[in-house]
Amino acid sequence: MATPRGLGALLLLLLLPTSGQEKPTEGPRNTCLGSNNMYDIFNLNDKALCFTKCRQSGSDSCNVENLQRYWLNYEAHLMKEGLTQKVNTPFLKALVQNLSTNTAEDFYFSLEPSQVPRQVMKDEDKPPDRVRLPKSLFRSLPGNRSVVRLAVTILDIGPGTLFKGPRLGLGDGSGVLNNRLVGLSVGQMHVTKLAEPLEIVFSHQRPPPNMTLTCVFWDVTKGTTGDWSSEGCSTEVRPEGTVCCCDHLTFFALLLRPTLDQSTVHILTRISQAGCGVSMIFLAFTIILYAFLRLSRERFKSEDAPKIHVALGGSLFLLNLAFLVNVGSGSKGSDAACWARGAVFHYFLLCAFTWMGLEAFHLYLLAVRVFNTYFGHYFLKLSLVGWGLPALMVIGTGSANSYGLYTIRDRENRTSLELCWFREGTTMYALYITVHGYFLITFLFGMVVLALVVWKIFTLSRATAVKERGKNRKKVLTLLGLSSLVGVTWGLAIFTPLGLSTVYIFALFNSLQGVFICCWFTILYLPSQSTTVSSSTARLDQAHSASQE
């Protein structure tokens, strides 16, 4: 399954445990599902067993939210003790010790995954995995404390579902590098906006081609279980590893995610721009042709099917136009202008998805339901849905300030393309729900209807079929036309692996969707009734239009 972010990007180149719970008096305890704040050896071993199971397989018995919060809060529990502590388990290594705030030197700690973190002196050889805490961090702490508690934690989250979040549950090869989290905490305080950032060095081998490394932290405020965010962190790739510079303290990791190099982005952008330009020409021809037919043929004033086709073509025309303006403008203009371009592009993208769904709904009435298909003011109601529903979604998304500058970077973290979309650092739930989730619903509905319609077409009796000689060719043309109307090619972004060939096919086919629609419209409506390719579909259109009168 391809990355949900891949749909937007390709188109644009295109455990706070609850307290007060009573123990059940009967039945066995299920600590994997339960939540508590007990850190004695008995409860700790229970949680460790659950954590191990979830790390390995992501069992249904896992309460991911509770387990994640449990281990995040375990660090805070260690901070409450007064003595230096070391924790050494197969998946958790932790060091807690007192540090003087009146220091003249930065503090260094090793982060070797197989060892408990330890303080490293300035004159020692620096370990490949390490963290540097600037002295200014301790001097800026509130309360004029002379001594503070510092906790350094290394957590192996394994390949399961823990600490994955929506950004990594995409099946596109993304993941936490070496399944390792590094936690930093000082004095049980929420430390943010450091004047001098801390530095974490992750050593690793050279990443695979078309993969990039990004420094992130676990943001517990995102959603119900938290998610990864890169806000406040910068990424610098060095020969010895990747350096993360962040202006706050929390749990950090290095994400490995698919990316596109500059040459690929450039080629895809040119393909998309050329395809969109050609598509706009054909879509404009479709709209003009419909206007001509509406003036010259009386039946086009009452038929709903041509109106729906033209509405879809209009939404795609405006979507292509918004895309060309967006790519051409890049980061130019004010933040408000970028917000507007992102909102307009999002709106017409949702309009295109909606009209594809309405095309499928109309096909359902024509070929599947057939009888009792009368709806008063049918096209008006479809228009309210096709143009109004996306507007409501964009208003809701825009009110959360989700639009802004979006940057596509290559594996060296160089900017490949800038445009206005969902801004970086914002919650991605709006993107997942209003773009990928919404498209998935309309796409699956369209596929079900298309399958039913194709089955009907290919099982027509010989009495109503056209001549045997050209039957198969005409059926194939009908299938291709219907596929264009319901947006079959968009499924490449959801149901196929995000390989380079898929990227090119997606960019080409979707930018040329307008060409397919124009050819379908011309073949279906321009010739006389006797030479129409899909006579069965035309008769269905006429029958449905008659029922609306």
UniProtKB/Swiss-Prot annotation:
Cortisol binds at N510. Disulfide bonds join C215-C244, C233-C246, C338-C420. InterPro entries: GAIN_B, GAIN_dom_sf, GPCR_2-like_7TM, GPCR_2_secretin-like, GPR1/GPR3/GPR5, GPS. The record marks L249, T250 as: Cleavage. Forms a heterodimer of 2 chains generated by proteolytic processing that remain associated through non-covalent interactions mediated by the GAIN-B domain. In the inactivated receptor, the Stachel sequence (also named stalk) is embedded in the GAIN-B domain, where it adopts a beta-strand conformation. On activation, the Stachel moves into the 7 transmembrane region and adopts a twisted hook-shaped configuration that forms contacts within the receptor, leading to coupling of a G-alpha protein, which activates signaling. GO terms for biological process: adenylate cyclase-activating G protein-coupled receptor signaling pathway; B cell differentiation; cell surface receptor signaling pathway; G protein-coupled receptor signaling pathway; negative regulation of CREB transcription factor activity; negative regulation of non-canonical NF-kappaB signal transduction; regulation of cell migration. It holds the Pfam family GPS. Keywords: Cell membrane, Disulfide bond, G-protein coupled receptor, Glycoprotein, Membrane, Receptor, Signal, Transducer, Transmembrane, Transmembrane helix. GO terms for molecular function: G protein-coupled receptor activity. Residues 107-262 form the GAIN-B domain. Expressed in cultured primary dermal lymphatic endothelial cells. Highly expressed in polymorphonuclear cells (PMNs) including neutrophilic, eosinophilic, and basophilic granulocytes. CDD domains: 7tmB2_GPR97. Residues 1-20 form the signal peptide. The Stachel sequence (also named stalk) in the C-terminal part of the extracellular domain (ECD) functions as a tethered agonist. In the inactivated receptor, the Stachel sequence (also named stalk) is embedded in the GAIN-B domain, where it adopts a beta-strand conformation. On activation, the Stachel moves into the 7 transmembrane region and adopts a twisted hook-shaped configuration that forms contacts within the receptor, leading to coupling of a G-alpha protein, which activates signaling. Adhesion G-protein coupled receptor (aGPCR) for glucocorticoid hormones such as cortisol, cortisone and 11-deoxycortisol. Ligand binding causes a conformation change that triggers signaling via guanine nucleotide-binding proteins (G proteins) and modulates the activity of downstream effectors, such as adenylate cyclase. ADGRG3/GPR97 is coupled to G(o)/GNAO1 G proteins and mediates signaling by inhibiting adenylate cyclase activity. May also signal through G-alpha(q)-proteins; additional evidence are however required to confirm this result in vivo. This is Adhesion G protein-coupled receptor G3. The lineage of its organism: Eukaryota, Metazoa, Chordata, Craniata, Vertebrata.
